[in-house]
Amino acid sequence: MAQTDNHLVIMAGGVGGRFWPMSTADCPKQFIDVLGVGRSLIQLTYDRFAGVVPSDNVWVVTNQKYVSLVHEQLPEIPLNHILSEPCRRNTAPCIAYVSWRIKKENPKANIVVSPSDHIVTNEAEFKRVISNCLKFTAETDAVVTLGMKPTRPETGYGYIQADLSTASARNREIYRVDQFREKPDLPTAEQYIKQNNFFWNAGIFIWSASTIVNAFRIYQPSIARIFERIMDVLDTADEQRVIDEVYPECENISVDYAIMEKAEEIFVCPADFGWSDLGTWGSLLAQTQHDIYGNTVIGKDVHLFDSKNCIVHTTEERKVVIQGLDGYIVAEQDGKLLICRLSEEQRLKQFTGEG
């Protein structure tokens, strides 16, 4: 497998409403320096594939309104690799579009699909796992998804049940998927944790271009027909005009329902590289450094007194003083201020009306 055949697809069309006020419809969280490290989440996603996928083989699928943001933050990737969705249709049409596009450019392409807003703390292990999976999919017709080894009974993630009794003959770290499970209630999640064959579904996929295109032809023929019909205009001056016309015809469906739960050659690679989907303020608190009282502070002039288990995030050069809070989010961005119990953050979209 030549590294020049490796391609990365970054899905970057989401709004991230659960991270209000930092993340808004005008500038979602993937374009923000959430961790205070000088790089946005989409830039960190791009960075962690260095040495695995050449920059010329990186693709981003995003909403039309974010194309300029992607180009501004990732100037290294070809401009014609930033694909613009005219409307939101979930992950299956997004992946189909870019897969047909990549296959037209390189029929031998091997593809990793990654969300734009996850974080990884052990990048060396991440690269090892991804490279291992790419080698496997280059040699087989398999569809591989990464399964994160759970560290707690999490109810916010879907789970993958693996058959650990038999590893693939080609790769001893990759196993067949028994079943995909929906987000569980707490008692069910606690049962999953007691077993060693349940993994968090990270939404990271690895497959060859020919494998995923064939899977769409078999399991989602209506979506496949749309992109087969427009193959001749892909990578031409007419591409965006035609995509704007036909993309709304695609069914609004996730790749999990469209392909993963139907296909036969589905494998999971259990992994442990410090992963978080960073979907909530609570997940950010769990992934960042705390003071001795369990507080996380991202900001230049923040002072806490008699407070614990709080996350404070400010991007403005303002003095922030907090006293007597336990388990709160305090976040400020562009004149908007959030003060909310961490235990109530699932209601943020309800509170703000955004996302």
What residue spans do the PLM features occupy?
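General beta-strand structural signal in soluble alpha/beta enzymes
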Residues: 60, 83-84, 113, 144-148, ...
